[in-house]
Amino acid sequence: MKAKISEIFESLFNSELRLILKNPISIGSISEPSEDLQCTAVRLDEHAINMISKPCERAKKYVILKNPYHIKFMDNPSEELQILAVSKEPDSIELIENPCLRAKFACIYSKPENIRYIKNPDKEIQVSAIQKSPCLISELENPCEAAQLTAVLNTPDTIFNIPQPSIRTMLVAVEKLAGFKIFPSDKNLDTITGIITQCYKL
């Protein structure tokens, strides 16, 4: 990106700005650069942020807006930065060590399928994604019971896509598929388990 005309004029009276306009990476040679200098440097070259020992939040935003994947190189990025990154590139959440819950929601907001990028998704995230797309239950390694129930209540035959459904999930699914209530006795639950097991083998 090119320098602004106003920056060029200002650089006539500011040697540090003049240095950065010539070579943004040279900000590393400036002790405690101002926020404006940091932002100018990263706007011209996003990699300049690696030369700043304590980059300001505004400079970080400039970088994330240009390249969301740069969040990988930021220590403890703020919630706002995490959300900004995953809103632009959902799979960038894989580069965040401990993504916040709001960033996870932002990741699946437009496409619930993006849950595949989230390691060990929280219960709330699982349920939110499954509400939008019940068939996604098959992509969850260990879906929580709430997510299982959400799936079968919306689409009963998703029971056959759940590796180890809970007894309660199987009961609800069979009731939905059969169209009538089933008394949850031990005998009935054993029968339901057998039915589901047999269906898996089909």
Predicted regions: what they are:
Residues K2-L202:
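Alpha-helical scaffold segments
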